[in-house]
């Protein structure tokens, strides 16, 4: 239940026979069966069932992949490869020694979307997986060096990449118990920075005392996503006019491969904070994803209403008693909403008097919307929203 994209279940045994296999989409306010197939399961056979394709272009389908139950020979690893990336063309897949020249090698397989290899056994050891468009030497995915352990029995599926980086695919590697993503070796991490301190001047953001990530960012502005190498960083937030004036010194952050983050400078200039939030920018064709973050110390504890008409007198808040915290910013997470017209109203906790009222918002399926509540620009002013993602996207 609740299986997200690029997630695989463990492998389990069932009796032979014919089974009705269905996939139910979890939609805002409702569920609907979107895929169904009758599959006959035979003895001594492995079945891996993929949901592949695209909801947006109505190409969603079930893809059963089979293999004969085969023990892994001692000293070997066993692999089955599936092309499950609907957005990728027919490709050549190379599995070579890490230092092999691609021009000297032959592809293990040429595969179009939905193709799968048989089980392939290779000596355990270090390998490199590279993918090119069929007939081309232009590498669009490079795993770098990966280790195939003695006795490993792996299902490797090329899936559409929805993380950071330029590769069109991410490999999903399943061992029968769990699954992990194998990113292209050149995949970065994405980070954007939000200036949410109303009484602070324009700032520069510097990583590891040398890398200027952001220059002259003023309140209440935000950057676009910046691609950086995955690593541990120490972040300084300094005055743009004089970098010797340090507001935030050596804030430790870890940026992981393929992930996206929002760093929010918040609180007040006398006690500045830097919070790092992990983002989930993958778009879902059947819903609008909405996220609200509380970064306004002046607002205190708030109630957040999401309604169809802006009237809150007789309704309960969608999120009640949301506090501003210097430990970790409170947020709603990504809330799935059906496409349509909405009004977001923020009040002091227990009050029906609006501190923030967005007015009418038209939210579209397949879009992501983020709003950050921060202090008003002037002392005593009401809180305001910094809008990100598709709230401010250019049509």
Range-by-range predicted roles:
Residues 1-395:
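Intrinsically disordered, low-complexity polar regions and short flexible loop motifs
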């Amino acid at each position: 239940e609740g299986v997200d994209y690029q997630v695989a279940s463990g492998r389990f045994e069932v009796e032979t026979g014919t089974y009705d296999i269905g996939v139910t989409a979890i939609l805002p306010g409702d569920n609907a069966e979107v895929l169904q197939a009758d599959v006959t399961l035979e003895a001594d056979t492995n079945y891996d069932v993929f949901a592949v394709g695209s909801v947006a272009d109505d190409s969603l389908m079930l893809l059963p992949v089979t293999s004969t139950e085969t023990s892994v020979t001692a000293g070997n690893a066993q692999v089955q490869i599936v092309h499950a990336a609907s957005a990728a063309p027919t490709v050549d897949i190379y599995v070579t020694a890490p230092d092999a020249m691609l021009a000297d090698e032959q592809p293990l397989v040429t595969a179009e979307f939905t193709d799968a290899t048989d089980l392939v056994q290779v000596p355990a050891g270090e390998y490199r997986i590279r993918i090119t468009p069929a007939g081309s030497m232009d590498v669009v995915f490079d795993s770098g060096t990966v280790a195939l352990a003695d006795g490993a029995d792996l299902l490797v599926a090329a899936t559409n990449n929805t993380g950071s980086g330029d590769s069109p695919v991410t490999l999903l590697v399943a061992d029968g118990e769990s699954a992990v993503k194998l990113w292209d070796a050149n995949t970065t991490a994405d980070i954007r920075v939000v200036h949410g301190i109303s009484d602070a001047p324009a700032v520069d953001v510097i990583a590891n005392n040398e890398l200027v990530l952001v220059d002259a960012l003023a309140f209440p502005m935000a950057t676009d996503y910046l691609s950086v190498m995955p690593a541990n960083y120490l972040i300084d937030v300094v005055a743009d006019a004089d970098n010797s004036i340090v507001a935030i010194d050596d804030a430790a952050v870890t940026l992981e491969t393929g992930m996206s983050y929002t760093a929010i400078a918040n609180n007040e200039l006398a006690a500045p904070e830097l919070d790092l939030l992990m983002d989930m920018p993958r778009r879902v064709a059947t819903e609008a994803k909405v996220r609200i973050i509380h970064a306004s110390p002046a607002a205190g504890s708030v109630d957040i209403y999401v309604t169809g008409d802006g009237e809150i007198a007789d309704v309960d808040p969608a999120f009640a008693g949301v506090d501003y915290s210097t430990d970790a910013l409170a947020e709603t997470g990504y809330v799935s909403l059906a496409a349509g017209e909405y009004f977001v109203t923020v009040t002091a906790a227990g009050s029906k008097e609006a501190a923030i009222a967005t007015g009418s918002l038209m939210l579209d399926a397949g879009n992501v919307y983020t709003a950050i509540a921060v202090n008003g620009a002037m002392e005593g002013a009401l809180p305001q929203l910094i809008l990100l993602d598709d709230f401010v996207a250019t049509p």
